Every structure is written in C-alpha cells, then in structure tokens.
Swiss-Prot record:
GO terms for biological process: glycine decarboxylation via glycine cleavage system; nucleoside metabolic process. The gene is gcvPA. Its EC number is 1.4.4.2. Keywords: Oxidoreductase. It comes from the Bacteria. CDD domains: GDC-P. This is Probable glycine dehydrogenase (decarboxylating) subunit 1.
C-alpha cells in the first residue's frame, strides 16, 4: 500500500475551508501538557527504498521459529501446516469474500462455515458451535457474558490456572458489563481448590484444561458442583490438538466450551490473526454470541446454507444483541476446516499422540538436568519447569545458545510471584536432536 501524503497546498486549502489559520490553531483545544514535544522533531521523510532497507534491518533481528530448537507455547503453538491449506485459502473466492449476507451467491462460504461448526461441535462434544470468534481469549470473555444472560446472575469464578491473558480479557469485558469476577490464585502443580469458591450466586465457573501450566484437569466434579449450585461450567483450552486425545469437555459436563483454534491450519504469525472456537448446548443457542450458519432447502428443494442466527448488534438493536462481534475470523476458520479435513479423525488422533510422546520425551530429558524439576504429573504437549533462579534469565541464556526454551510464567503474570517457572511446549515439529540440544544447553546454563 502506497502512502500519499498531503502537499503544503492541500493543507492550506483544508485549513482555509474550516477557518483555521494554522495547524496549531486546529489543535488549540488540546492542553499543552498533553502534547508530546518529541512529535515536533520527527525525522525527515525517506524514500521508499530507504524505508525498505530500514525495516529489513529491523526484521533481520528476528529469529525464525524454524531456524532453532523451538519450545515456545503458552497459548500459541508451532505446528506443521500442509501446503494444501495455504493454496486453497488463497483462492480469490475465499480470500476476498466478505460476510455472506446474500446466500444465493455465497454458498461456498456458508458451506465451509457449516462444516467448520460441525467439526468444532464434534471436537468439543457439544451440540452447536458458532462460525468462530476473534480468538480464544475473547471467546472466553463472551462465554462469561453469555452465562450471565442464561443464569441471570453476575458472579463468575475463574480458576487460577486459566491463562493470564484470558483472565485479563474476561476481567476487562466483565468490568464494563458491571459483573463480578472471582479470580483464584494459580497453582502450578495442579489440584487447585475450585469447588469451595462456588456458591448460590455463581453464574459460571471458568476452568482450563490443559491449563496454562499444562495440567490436565478432571472437569466432572467441577461440573457437578457448578450444576448443583445452578451455575454453568465453561471449559477453556488453548491447544485444540489436545482434543484429539483428551475426553471432550462436553462429555465431562461442560455447558460452554471455548478455546483457541490456531494450532490447526494457522501459523504463529506474530500472535494473530487467530480463530476462536465457541460451542454450547442446543438449549442455549439463542444466547450464543456471533453468528450461525445453518442448513436449509431452496425454492427448488435443493440443499442450501444460510445465516441462521446472527444476534449481533449489526443486525438487531444493540441492547438486544448477544455480542458486538463484527467480522469473524472466517479465513482462519477456513484454514482450520481444510487442515482438520485433511487430518481426519485418525490423523488428528495420531497427531495428538505424537505431540504427547514428544513432550514426555522432552520432560524426561530436562528432568535429568541437575536443579530442574518438572511440576506436572499429567500433561498433553506442554509442561512446567521449576529452575534455580529467575526463569527470565535462564530463557535469555538459552536463547544466546540458540535454543528458544519456552515462556517464563512471569512474562504472562509479572505479579504472581512465580518467577522460577518456565512453560515448555513440544509438538510434532520437534526432533530428537532438538530435545538433546535443549537438555545440553540447559545443563550448561545452570552449571
């Protein structure tokens, strides 16, 4: 995209039209204390070639994930995406299409959204899923607001082991909705006491499995306690591949299942765009945010697809809308659908088992390093290390040796007081050589 700046003549004409003698006069209403004097000393303009060189030098400082042993996760995971996925989503009818308001000319888009919803419903063990959300964290926040509408209560209990970024998003949306959020303290080893926080005023309980530390959580007793109190259980996940191996949240009693779908079909891409997954029970479908693609028949009796429910503020009155979500993550949802279709049920299960096996091998190697403790007993493809000293320092020293060893929990939650923990993820991408390099580098760093 080219940047075409205004000429001095353009500015003079615009100021004259609105009756302002100068640019300073135009902004005279802004208090001087609020103005940044540094903006007046911006460097002179550069040529396009010069800008390209400057940006190229900056980007050269990045370390491509595929160039080093890579064990970073904590909500965004590096998986292999088949070339077929990118090839298909770049077809112009998919890449440039917008909201399918006219079903007679958008059957392809509506059908893949319908297939996406079907896949999400099967993965989560739920009866209905929407056409995607922005990402996992916003899906979690919308789930809390939905639970408040269903139960007519305003108190949400959020487990301490839910990803800190998800907790922040929930707290932000709940603040403006005038809701109460009871956030528990994190318990890295798992087994946090969620049940005692549930009472007769609770609208929902938000639990993540695998949680941010990698622990697999048994949702059934939490679901029983929540339902006994008249509350809903919201199950959250950040690693959708785990559903190829772990019992679906719906089968464990969850009422709403939300999470991040990035791991299937979508690369890391600097943290977005991603695709939020949202599924629930049929009886709650009219309180579900976003939109729903449904199957019907046309005037000739042929099978067709339409937007069935779109209770969002673009379509109805704002005060009646279930969500303000606008354009959903449609292209990312298509990538998810294509990749999962290529995998199939058997392929997804094999992929999940490979992830788990690689993580177990890595955990065994790292646990053998003196001073290192693996905190998890049951995990999928991510686990937590306790290391001597500050985890941030250890990670930086590992990076200097060419190993991206994970995410210090302190970077996600600086005030949690868990400065010695590292979240480590292993996927199908990692090799035996990668694992050996990590263990050797960690041993040297801690020596």
């Amino acid at each position: 995209m080219r940047y075409l700046p205004l000429t001095p003549e353009d500015r003079t004409e615009m100021l004259a039209r609105i009756g302002a003698p100068s640019v300073d006069a135009l902004f005279a209403d802004i208090p001087a204390a609020k103005l940044d004097p540094a903006l007046a000393d911006l460097p002179a303009h550069k040529t396009e070639l010069s800008v390209e060189r400057t940006l190229g030098a900056l980007s050269a400082q990045n370390v491509p994930a595929g160039s080093v042993p890579f064990f970073v996760g904590a909500g965004a995971y590096r998986h292999h995406v088949p070339a077929t996925v990118d090839h298909l989503i770049q077809r112009s009818e998919f890449l440039t299409s917008y909201t399918p308001y006219q079903p007679e000319i958008a059957q392809g888009t509506l059908q893949y959204l319908f297939e996406f919803q079907t896949q999400v419903g099967e993965l989560t063990g739920m009866e209905v899923a929407n056409a995607s959300m922005y990402d996992g964290s916003t899906a979690a926040a919308e789930a809390v607001l939905m639970a408040h509408r269903v139960t007519k209560r305003r108190k949400a209990v959020v487990a301490g082991n839910v990803h800190p970024h998800y907790r922040e998003t929930i707290a932000t949306l709940s603040l403006y909705a005038d809701d109460a959020v009871v956030a528990l303290s994190p318990v890295p080893q798992g087994g946090e006491d969620i049940l005692s926080a549930i009472d007769g005023e609770t609208s929902c309980v938000v639990v993540q499995s695998p949680d941010v530390f990698g622990n697999i959580v048994d949702l059934k007793p939490i679901a029983e306690k929540a339902h006994a109190a008249g509350a809903l259980l919201i199950a959250v996940f950040t690693e959708v591949v785990s559903l190829g191996l772990i019992e679906p949240p719906g089968a464990q009693g969850a009422d709403i299942v939300v999470g991040e779908g990035q791991s299937i079909g979508n690369p890391l891409t600097f943290g977005g765009p991603y695709v939020g997954l949202f599924a629930t029970r049929q009886k709650y479908v009219r309180q579900m945010p976003g939109r729903l693609a449904g199957e019907t028949v046309d005037a000739s009796g042929k099978r067709g697809f339409v937007l069935t429910l779109s209770t969002r503020e673009q379509h109805i009155r704002r005060e009646k809308a279930t969500s303000n979500i606008c354009t959903n993550s449609g292209l990312c949802a298509l990538a998810f659908t294509i990749h999962l279709t290529l995998l199939g049920e058997t392929g997804l299960r094999k992929l999940a088992r490979l992830n788990h096996a690689n993580a177990c091998k890595l955990a065994d190697k790292l646990a053998a390093v003196p001073g290192v403790q693996v905190l998890n007993s049951a995990f999928f493809n991510e686990f937590t290390l306790r290391v001597p000293g500050k985890a941030v320092d250890v990670i930086e020293k590992l990076a200097a040796k060419g190993v991206l060893g994970g995410v210090p929990y302190a970077r996600l939650a600086p005030k949690a007081g868990l400065d010695d923990l590292i979240l480590v993820a292993a996927t199908e991408i990692n090799t035996d050589e990668d694992r050996a390099a990590y263990a050797a580098a960690l041993k040297e760093v801690l020596a």
